[in-house]
Amino acid sequence: MKKYVQLLIVVGLLLMGATGSWSQVKDIKWGTSAVGSSGYRALVNLTALLNREMPDYRFTALPMPGAIVSVKGYAMGKLDACYGADSAFYELASNINRFKGFKAKMKRQPVQSFWTFTVEVGVGIHSRDRGKYRQWRDLSGKRVFTGPLPWDVRAQLERAFQTLGVKHKYVEVDLATVGSLLEQGRIDGFITYTNAEATTAPWIIETSLVTDFAILNPSEQEVKILKQTGFSITEVDPKIFKKSVYVDKVLYLPFYYGFNIGLDMPEADVYRMLNIIEKKAAELAKSDAGFAQIKADMAAMQRKGVEAAIEYVPVHPGLAKWMREKGIWDSKWDSRIAK
């Protein structure tokens, strides 16, 4: 009897230890863009929701100099999740531009797990210069802040400028000084952008409080050239900027952004995470209008994002399962599911 009691005690201790390990909270270090950016704001809201709804995880939003720094951090095993765009994944897969030489040394491949919104990119100028600049090519030779060096929005605008032959003088400045520099005439133009065609970045809102900027749209000929070379063009409502930007419609170049967690989170948990996001989409959109596209049609956003990046990075099995259940998975992508 004594041995039996001792055995029960040992088994009980083992079970207590196992239960402790099962209930252990897993930390997720999630990289995003800099404080003041749309990506940082969005991830802060997303992780707040996930921390509440997934108590077995502890999500932390970590600001980086730019989204690609988070992609590189994940690929080198320093982060558990990243903030990545289809344009960045293209550069990574092609071993070019900001990722030139990086592919050979990375330790793991980023994966697609949650496409969040589109980002739409364009140009702003001072309102007093509206008669001076009529199209993007008029900025050739001018001082233009196209965004911080690591940022994907800058890469998108620079690629468009290169396509159009815009040979501007790139000026790197602190985001907090853009408005004053434009007001003083020390820069002639700057990057503007929106998220989900519904909101803009905090730093752009702050810029509008310091100076009176106008949107500079590409000309009809420039739009034609951009479309012929693979760019999409979308029309954004100027009311997003909460001020007059002196155009009836804003012509922007969209691309896709996602908050992508790696294979350390198993299929079942990513699937659960996506269902939580879908269920709470209205709450997310209320806290940040950047989630408007998720609220409107999360399934469509996942399909569009996957279509844009399927050739460059694989898909998390949790996202693949979720998309299959929604009837939006294409069987030709089966070989692109991450293992």
Model-flagged regions — what are they?
Residues 25-53, 57-60, 121-184, 194-195, ...:
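Bilobed "Venus flytrap"/periplasmic-binding protein-like clamshell domains
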Residues 134-135, 140-159, 230-299:
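Ligand-binding clefts/hinges and TM-proximal coupling segments of bilobed small-molecule sensing domains
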